[in-house]
Amino acid sequence: MTACSTTPTTSATSAQPAAGSPLQWHARPSKSDTLPFEGAWSVQAIQELLDKPFMDLMFQAQSVHREHWPAGDIELATLLSVKTGGCPENCGYCPQAAEFDTGVKAEKLMSVDEVTRAAQAAKDAGATRFCMGAAWRAPKDRDIEKMNELIGAVKGLGMQTCATLGMLQPHQAQSLREAGLDYYNHNLDTAPEYYQDVVSTRQYQDRLDTLKAVRGAGISVCCGGIIGMGEAPVHRAGLIAQLANLNPHPESVPINSLVRVPGTPLADSEPVDPLDFVRVIAVARITMPTARVRLSAGRQQLGDAVQALCFMAGANSIFYGDKLLVTGNPDVEADTTLLRKLGLSGTRTSVQE
């Protein structure tokens, strides 16, 4: 496994809460915010990290990173949309929502042969994890059966598998696990108090309920969020608090920079400050020391220099390939060149104790 359940050494920079706490979202942050278990990260503490002098924050994040991960190790993951468009949800950032005019056409679920060919191409290009996304609100049991076939085909190539399919029931998560699924992605997107500004067709607790079902089935969790949706700094701190206080924290944490797609409600959002994005990466590393922190959507708009800072801040995974679901991504040659210039290697290792 890429990031295992190894318990990290507790320190002032990488404290983790005790196991067994329920998944629930925390109250609106305030100076008197009381979190549900001893050792949890408060929103205020995370905000203080985000506000640290940049060089001090980078040093702390890189120090935590080297305590738990080999220097220069970057996981390469590929993401494929196996069922595109037509989603009944109204996520303000997503071009696959049926109600938005973004030019994305609804397509049926891809065949086993199509997915196998795409996975083999990703493996040949150096990817070690293959992620499959389907634009469903909540898959039906018959959809899960079809996904199980795709999971089996990709596992047969010797790759790790990840899926993002929407909200799951516990029995569906168990079925995916029995098919061999390694990771399930279900992002929290933002802080709970800002969530309804982004999407109104579901509740924050719906996300946490699916994460609970995934954990209960024994599937590793991939869960992160999006920066640049008009949120305030406290909402960024609130997102990281939610992620870091999941018990245990996610094995993979994808951090996205909003891709402003014409036709979506968030298309006119102000671009995120690049250094603010790097700060989020650094604090994610400090608060979730054994997670794979993944640079996800929006890497094209960051540029090489900012990506290099993100790697220094503790990012150790990227989505690899020229397309992420329906948005662009740096091509393989560009990523290979960047990693080579930085002396980084696209290999897969486990967390260090």
Swiss-Prot record:
Superkingdom field: Bacteria
EC number: 2.8.1.6
GO molecular function term, any single one: 2 iron, 2 sulfur cluster binding
Record SMART domains: BATS (SM00876), Elp3 (SM00729)
Region Disordered, annotated ranges: 1-30
Listed CDD domains: Radical_SAM (cd01335)
Amino-acid positions noted as binding [4Fe-4S] cluster in the UniProt annotation, renumbered to this chain: 87, 91, 94
Note accompanying the cofactor annotation: Binds 1 [4Fe-4S] cluster. The cluster is coordinated with 3 cysteines and an exchangeable S-adenosyl-L-methionine. Binds 1 [2Fe-2S] cluster. The cluster is coordinated with 3 cysteines and 1 arginine.
InterPro entries: Aldolase_TIM, BATS_dom, Biotin_synth/BioAB, Biotin_synthase, Elp3/MiaA/NifB-like_rSAM, rSAM
Domain Radical SAM core: 72-299
Subunit organization: Homodimer.
Gene Ontology biological-process annotations: biotin biosynthetic process
Protein's name according to its UniProt entry: Biotin synthase
Record pathway: Cofactor biosynthesis; biotin biosynthesis; biotin from 7,8-diaminononanoate: step 2/2
Transmembrane helix recorded as keyword: no
Enzyme's top EC category: transferase
Organism: Delftia acidovorans (strain DSM 14801 / SPH-1)
Gene name tied to this protein: bioB
KW Metal-binding (keyword) present: yes
Residues involved in [2Fe-2S] cluster binding: 131, 162, 222, 294
Biased composition (Low complexity): 1-22
Keyword annotations from UniProtKB, A to Z: 2Fe-2S, 4Fe-4S, Biotin biosynthesis, Iron, Iron-sulfur, Metal-binding, S-adenosyl-L-methionine, Transferase
Reactions mediated catalytically: (4R,5S)-dethiobiotin + (sulfur carrier)-SH + 2 reduced [2Fe-2S]-[ferredoxin] + 2 S-adenosyl-L-methionine = (sulfur carrier)-H + biotin + 2 5'-deoxyadenosine + 2 L-methionine + 2 oxidized [2Fe-2S]-[ferredoxin]
Family assignment from sequence similarity: Belongs to the radical SAM superfamily. Biotin synthase family.
Family annotation (SUPFAM superfamilies): Radical SAM enzymes
